[in-house]
A protein has these predicted regions:
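Cell-envelope/extracellular polymer assembly enzymes that use nucleotide-activated donors
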Residues: 4-7, 35, 189
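Short beta-strand/loop segment that forms part of the nucleotide-sugar
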Residues: 33-43, 62
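A conserved acidic beta->alpha catalytic loop
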Residues: 39-48, 92-93
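Glycine-rich, basic loop-to-helix element that forms the pyrophosphate-binding segment
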Residues: 63-80
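Short aromatic/hydrophobic "clamp" motif used to bind/position activated sugar donors
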Residues: 85
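Conserved donor NDP-sugar-binding/catalytic core segment of glycosyltransferases
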Residues: 93, 97-131
Length: 197
């Protein structure tokens, strides 16, 4: 596990204060991150001080009309040479210092595992429905799902969170990566394809 290179990829648009907190927490992970690739939409909204503060950042700017959930992530994956690519949203905040370590561990325990996603915890002041949805999509126990689980989970068999998910580069590339035209659910579309290989 120690020779595995990890890049974190974050599409961003007008990142706020929580973005700096996210980067800060990523730099303190127990498993080292090679670099954090930020795909920033609209350079006007980018805070250049972040690059001065965090040398681990590699920022690529694109215009708003160029952004696409699938294509932007696919482009970032092409920029990465890491063994594991962790895709996160700009508002995802690691709850602890072992996030990356746990994702890498999940990917390396079984050579057939191509993706792993982190548990998303609800905010304290969110609605009951949101808390219930989070507990269903992100149970407190890890699970490995395959197409054999379709009778149990239905379409949720292919659930993979775009908030925070890790992908093995070799499997990702073999499957062709994310679809280039996806306004949402690029992660789930990828997982459906992976499960049918």
């Amino acid at each position: 596990m120690e020779n595995i290179k990890v890049d974190v990829i974050i599409p961003a648009y007008h990142p706020g204060k929580e973005f700096s907190t996210l980067i800060e927490r990523l730099t303190k992970q127990t498993f080292p991150i090679h670099r954090i690739i930020v795909m920033n939409t609209e350079e006007t909204y980018w805070n250049k001080e972040l690059e001065e503060k965090f040398s681990i950042l590699e920022v690529h700017h694109l215009k708003k009309q160029e952004f696409d959930h699938g294509a932007t992530r696919a482009w970032a994956a092409e920029l990465s040479d890491a063994d594991v690519m962790v895709f996160m949203t700009q508002d995802a905040l690691p709850a602890d210092k072992s996030l990356i370590e746990n994702l890498v561990k999940a990917l390396t325990e079984d050579e057939k595992t191509g993706a792993a996603y982190a548990r998303q915890l609800p905010n304290e002041n969110c609605s009951f429905v949101e808390k219930y949805t989070r507990s269903f999509n992100y149970p407190d126990r890890s699970a490995v799902k395959t197409k054999d689980d379709l009778p149990v989970y239905g379409i949720k068999t292919f659930f993979c969170s775009n908030v925070c998910a890790a992908y093995k580069r070799d499997i990702y590339q073999k499957l062709g990566g994310f679809v280039r035209k996806a306004i949402f659910n690029e992660d789930m579309i990828y997982e459906i394809g992976r499960a049918h290989v």
